[in-house]
Structures are given as structure tokens and as C-alpha cells.
Curated annotation (Swiss-Prot):
Transmembrane region(s): 588-611
Subunit structure: Interacts with SNX17. Interacts with SELPLG/PSGL1 and PODXL2 and mediates neutrophil adhesion and leukocyte rolling. This interaction requires the sialyl-Lewis X epitope of SELPLG and PODXL2, and specific tyrosine sulfation on SELPLG. Interacts (via C-type lectin domain) with alpha-IIb/beta3 integrin ITGA2B:ITGB3 and alpha-V/beta-3 integrin ITGAV:ITGB3. Interacts with alpha5/beta1 integrin ITGA5:ITGB1 and alpha4/beta1 integrin ITGA4:ITGB.
Gene3D superfamilies documented for this protein: Complement Module, domain 1, Laminin, Mannose-Binding Protein A, subunit A
Domain EGF-like: residue ranges: 159-195
Cytoplasmic side: 612-646
Gene: SELP
Motif stretch (Endocytosis signal): 634-637
Keyword annotations from UniProtKB, A to Z: Calcium, Cell adhesion, Cell membrane, Disulfide bond, EGF-like domain, Glycoprotein, Lectin, Membrane, Metal-binding, Repeat, Signal, Sushi, Transmembrane, Transmembrane helix
Protein name (Swiss-Prot/TrEMBL): P-selectin
Species annotation: Bos taurus (Bovine)
Family statement drawn from the similarity comment of this UniProt entry: Belongs to the selectin/LECAM family.
Localization: Cell membrane
């Protein structure tokens, strides 16, 4: 019996020894793999073995938090003091990303103030040094940084963070410090752990005010929202919604409710207004009627009422002058109009002038009468013409006539047959006065004995369309050193060189320029407005004229016509369409249509009764006819007297 307890004691002793040895072996193994230095809550760690930068970061993230993210100079001094020297040094948590040095843990770019590079670093040798090491206990640069290739093997310098998921109550930023952390509270929160919410306090609501609130963080606290509305018959005076700010102050004072009142009305220009008021001016149930002076028509309702919502039943009407016909765009005349009561309305006056080289046929001034008609027909501009030029004997004539015939801006060039020379101008232009710039030249027989050898001659130039040309000929027309200057009329710009010279190579110094019309901005057309444009020099260019109109039943708000001016600006802004009252024709159409429909139904019923009686007498077994209109649609009738379609 004595041997049994002894055996049991030996077994327990052996088991304890085995566990102790096992624990010592495990501790030795861990010590071989990892050495560490701790400071209370935030601890630093380093690997005993060397790894590449990527593997070092994986090592730190697996066993700790990440590679060291250095926040200040004190931390660098602490690391240099406590971490042991190692000849290949330590990796830290900085790497080049998108060509910028970045803290990999926070993905924040390294600022210049936080840099701690060694002298002449980073140098990026061989363009592949994208990772950073720290010189721990270096004699020449203790605690300094150096850029290195990421594949090199160094010890991993890790840290374990103090901040946890619930640190700072999830209402502030947790900032690591050596041995602890601090909380930087988000706006609206305060306290050591950001556990408190700023409160704004409750309201003292004025009479007739109703309030609805939401309190995501506590009653009448930061981020609380309150909306307000009034009892029926009252309107809100003040903000409709308030918010509790992070400062603990509401965005405004609570609103008040006042009795509903409609906006004050004014008599329309060229018209009058008469109102029946309630207890106070322009309050609920007030009504106002409107009328216009002679020569003006009311656009809008004759009577408006103030509703319980504090708005009138319709906008205030206006008195609009009678409309005259729009000016045609085919007159080719320059028009300058004054519109005291709107574009082309009563008392509008338009004066007409013609461009250089044309003359006006008709009245130079038109006025819109109170009848809605102009006081005279529209004038037109006709081009000035020059006398027809004969072909020179023993020569040829070539002409360019942009306006047709021998009109203004026509140009003719003259040449002689072989053995003859030109006596007179080589070119003639039709001037605005209706005369050519010179007399027609003649071709004279050349004296072959005394005739000089031909000199340098460049191709003949002509003035660009809508432009001018002025040449200085030194030896002969368009000969050597001839210089020609070009320009454009108002509303056009020159494309090319403004001056050309004839070179000994018989070529001009550049291609002949052209004149292009000044461009205006493209007009944005939105439904339902309709726009028609004439573009003599290209879409939305100088001289382009656009007219506007609205669908039937809608009124044009703005100018009915705009012109692209020589400065590249439109003469007026784009108009809009707004709903208008029924016209007399529309009213008659609807009333007439209804009357015609009723008459048609009565007539159809009588005819149907007669047909049924007739069919019964014949008793031929055929079905009675269904009533059909002449349009072929069952039950549809029209009144031709009021049908607006042709």
C-alpha cells in the first residue's frame, strides 16, 4: 500500500516537470521569433528575423496592428533609445504611392513638417526605392529615414494600438499617444470619451404654431430637426425648419403665425384697378377687377380673388398695346425701331436705311397705328447698278458679279490677245455711286521692236466677299513688290493675312484672306416656343434674324424678334410662352361646335326614326343604319362655320 502513493506522487511530479519544460520551450521559441519593447497601452514590437517590406507589414498586421506610424520627434527619440541596434535597420510604415510618400496605415500623404529624412535622402537610386527604413542607433544619423528598395530584408518595426472600436464612444477621433490615447470629439460631442451630446433646449412656441421634431441623438440635441406649420387661415412668418447645431444653438428663432394676406396689387400700366376689401387690405376673400385704356387689350382675368392660401386666383393681368405685323426679313434694309409699348405694337416707329451700294424704295419711316396696321407698305433696298462694260477689241473681259448684273461690288478684269497690250486700268470696280472706278481700257498693238521683256507677274487678286482690298503697284499691276491690304465690313472678321506682297517667285506671300460673318451664341429653344430664322451669312451669324411665336392659347412673354448684331450679341433676349385666356375665335369655336353637335344629334335621331319606319314597311330583313358623321367617326360632328382648319 505504501508503494501506491509514492507512484502517484512520482506521476504528478513528472507531469508538472513536463509542463514546466514545455512552457519554457514555448517561451524560448517566442523569444527567438520576436523581441518587443512595451510602454503601457501603446506598445512597440520588432521581429527577430528580417523580411521584405511587404512581408514585414503582413507580419505586423498579423500579430499586432501595423508597421510603426511615427507622429512626432519625441516618438522618434523614444524608438532610437529603446529599440536595439541592427545592422540592416528596420522597416517603418511609409511607402511611395502614386509617386507620393504616404503613411500606409492612415493613407495620408507625408507632410513636409513630419519629414525626418537623413541628409541627401530620399535619393531613389535606380528608380526603385519606394519603401522607408529608420536608422535605429546609427552613429551618423540616429533616428533618421532613408528610402530603400522594398525587396530588401530588414527587421519589421511594429506597434500595437491603444484605440479600440468603441474608443471615444464612436463620436470622436481616437489619437494614439505613447502609453495612452486621447479623444478629439466630432462637432456636437464633448467629454473625455466624447460621451455627451450638445443640447440646444426646448422652444416656447408662439400661438397657432404647430411643430414636428426628430431627435436622433436626444431630445432637442445636436442634429435634432424641427419643422413648423400654422393652423388653417394663418401663414408662417419665419423659418419653416430649424436644426440644432454642433455649437448647441438653434439655426434660428422659432417662427410665428400671422393671418393670411395676399400680396399687394397695383393697377396695370395703361389700365385701372378696383378692389372690394375684407377686414384689412388684400386679405382672404378680397377681390379686385381690372380694365384697360382705349387702344390696349387686357391680357389675363378681369377679376382675381385672395384665397385662404394667401395667393391670388391668377396673376395680375396686363394691358398690352395692339400688335402690328412683324417686319419682313426680305427687305435687305437696316432697321432701327423704338417700341414704347412692346415690339411692333401701337406707337412703335421703325426707320429704314440701306447698306452702301443700295438705295431705298418706299417710305424711310413706318409707324404702328392704333388699328394694328403700319401707316405705309414696307420699303425695300435695291442694289445700285453700273453701266454694262463692253469687251475690248482684241481682248477679253472677265467679271465677278456677287449681286447679279453690273451691280455694286461687281469687279471686271481685262486682258489682251497676243500681240496687243492693255491701255488703261486692268481692273474696274462698280462703286456705291453707280459708276465704275475708271474708263474701260483698250487693246493696242504692241511694237515688237521696242516692247520690253515681260517681268515678274503674280496671280490677280480680288477683294474678298464682304471685304475690301487696296493695292500699291510698283512696276506693273500685281507685279514684283506689289503690296495689297485687305479689310472686312462691319459684322465680318478677316481670316488670313491682312497684307500680301508679290515675290520674285511669282507667288504671293500667303493665300488670299476671306471675310467671315461674326457668330452669335446659339439660341436655346425649349418647348412650346417655335422659332423661325433667316441666316444670310450662316447659322446664328451677323445679320441672322429669328422670330418667335407660341402655340394657340399661349402668350409670348418677351420680344417677338431678335437680330444678330455686328458685335456678336443678339439684340434681345429669348422670350417664353405662358398660358393666356381663350380668344374670341376659340370661344365661338367651342360654343359653335357644341351647338352643331346638339343640332346634329337631333337631326340624326329624326332621320333614324324615319328610316326605321321605312324599313318596317318594306320589311326586307336588313339591319338599321348606325348614325355616322361625314368624317366617318361614330358620334363625331363638326361645325364648318367655326372650323379653324382650311
Amino acid at each position: 500500500m505504501a508503494s501506491c502513493p509514492k507512484a502517484i506522487w512520482n506521476w504528478r511530479f513528472q507531469r508538472a516537470v513536463f509542463r514546466t519544460v514545455q512552457l519554457l520551450c514555448f517561451s524560448v521559441l517566442i523569444f527567438e521569433v520576436i523581441n518587443q519593447k512595451e510602454v503601457s497601452a501603446w506598445t512597440y514590437h520588432y521581429s527577430n528575423k528580417t523580411y521584405s517590406w511587404n512581408y514585414s507589414r503582413a507580419f505586423c498586421q498579423k500579430y499586432y496592428t501595423d508597421l510603426v506610424a511615427i507622429q512626432n520627434k519625441n516618438e522618434i527619440a523614444y524608438l532610437n533609445e529603446t529599440i536595439p541596434y541592427y545592422n540592416s535597420y528596420y522597416w517603418i510604415g511609409i511607402r511611395k504611392i502614386n509617386n507620393k510618400w504616404t503613411w500606409v496605415g492612415t493613407k495620408k500623404t507625408l507632410t513636409e513638417e513630419a519629414e525626418n529624412w537623413a541628409d541627401n535622402e530620399p535619393n531613389n537610386k535606380r528608380n526603385n526605392q519606394d519603401c522607408v527604413e529608420i536608422y535605429i542607433k546609427s552613429l551618423s544619423a540616429p533616428g533618421k529615414w532613408n528610402d530603400e528598395p522594398c525587396w530588401k530584408r530588414k527587421r519589421a518595426l511594429c506597434y500595437r494600438a491603444s484605440c479600440q472600436d468603441m474608443s471615444c464612444s464612436k463620436q470622436g477621433e481616437c489619437i494614439e499617444t505613447i502609453g495612452n490615447y486621447t479623444c478629439s470629439c466630432y462637432p456636437g460631442f464633448y467629454g473625455p470619451e466624447c460621451e455627451y451630446v450638445r443640447e440646444c433646449g426646448e422652444f416656447d412656441l408662439p400661438q397657432h404654431v404647430h411643430m414636428n421634431c426628430s431627435h436622433p441623438l436626444g431630445n432637442f440635441s445636436f442634429n435634432s430637426h424641427c419643422s413648423f406649420h400654422c393652423a388653417e387661415g394663418y401663414a408662417l412668418n419665419g423659418p419653416s425648419e430649424l436644426e440644432c447645431l454642433a455649437s448647441g444653438i438653434w439655426t434660428n428663432s422659432p417662427p410665428q403665425c400671422v393671418a393670411v394676406q395676399c400680396p399687394a396689387l397695383k393697377s396695370p400700366e395703361q389700365g385701372s384697378m378696383s378692389c372690394v376689401q375684407s377686414a384689412e387690405a388684400f386679405q382672404h376673400q378680397s377681390s379686385c377687377s381690372f380694365s384697360c385704356e382705349e387702344g390696349f387689350a387686357l391680357v389675363g382675368p378681369e377679376v382675381v380673388h385672395c384665397t385662404a392660401l394667401g395667393v391670388w386666383t391668377a396673376p395680375t393681368p396686363v394691358c398690352k398695346a395692339l400688335q402690328c405685323q412683324d417686319l419682313p426679313t426680305s427687305t435687305k434694309a437696316r432697321v432701327n425701331c423704338s417700341h414704347p409699348f412692346g415690339d411692333f405694337r401701337y406707337q412703335s416707329t421703325c426707320s429704314f436705311t440701306c447698306d452702301e451700294g443700295s438705295f431705298l424704295v418706299g417710305a424711310s419711316v413706318l409707324q404702328c397705328l392704333d388699328t394694328g396696321n403700319w401707316d405705309a407698305p414696307f420699303p425695300e433696298c435695291q442694289a445700285v447698278t453700273c453701266a454694262a462694260l463692253p469687251n475690248p477689241q482684241n481682248g477679253e473681259k472677265t467679271c465677278v458679279q456677287p449681286l447679279g448684273g453690273s451691280s455694286y461690288e461687281s469687279t471686271c478684269w481685262f486682258t489682251c490677245h497676243e500681240g496687243f497690250s492693255l491701255s488703261g486700268p486692268e481692273r474696274l470696280d462698280c462703286t456705291p455711286s453707280g459708276h465704275w472706278t475708271g474708263s474701260p481700257p483698250t487693246c493696242e498693238e504692241v511694237d515688237t521692236v521696242s516692247a520690253p521683256a515681260p517681268g515678274v507677274q503674280c496671280p490677280t487678286l480680288i477683294a474678298p466677299k464682304q471685304g475690301t482690298m487696296s493695292c500699291q503697284h510698283h512696276v506693273r499691276n500685281f507685279g514684283l513688290n506689289t503690296t495689297c491690304h485687305f479689310g472686312c465690313k462691319a459684322g465680318f472678321t478677316l481670316l488670313g493675312d491682312s497684307a500680301l506682297q508679290c515675290r520674285p517667285s511669282r507667288q504671293w506671300t500667303a493665300a488670299a484672306p476671306t471675310c467671315r460673318a461674326v457668330k452669335c451664341a446659339k439660341l436655346p429653344v425649349t418647348e412650346p416656343i417655335v422659332m423661325n430664322c433667316s441666316n444670310p451669312w450662316g447659322n446664328f451669324s451677323y445679320g441672322s434674324t429669328c422670330s418667335f411665336h407660341c402655340p394657340e392659347g399661349q402668350l409670348l412673354n418677351g420680344s417677338e424678334r431678335t437680330v444678330c448684331q455686328e458685335n456678336g450679341q443678339w439684340s434681345t433676349t429669348m422670350p417664353t410662352c405662358q398660358a393666356g385666356p381663350l380668344t374670341i375665335q376659340e370661344t365661338l369655336t367651342y360654343v359653335g361646335g357644341a351647338a352643331a353637335g346638339t343640332t346634329g344629334l337631333v337631326t340624326g335621331s329624326i332621320l333614324l326614326a324615319l328610316l326605321r319606319r321605312r324599313c318596317r314597311q318594306k320589311d326586307d330583313g336588313k339591319s338599321p343604319l348606325n348614325p355616322q358623321s361625314h368624317l366617318g367617326t361614330y358620334g363625331v360632328f363638326t361645325n364648318a362655320a367655326f372650323d379653324p382648319s382650311p
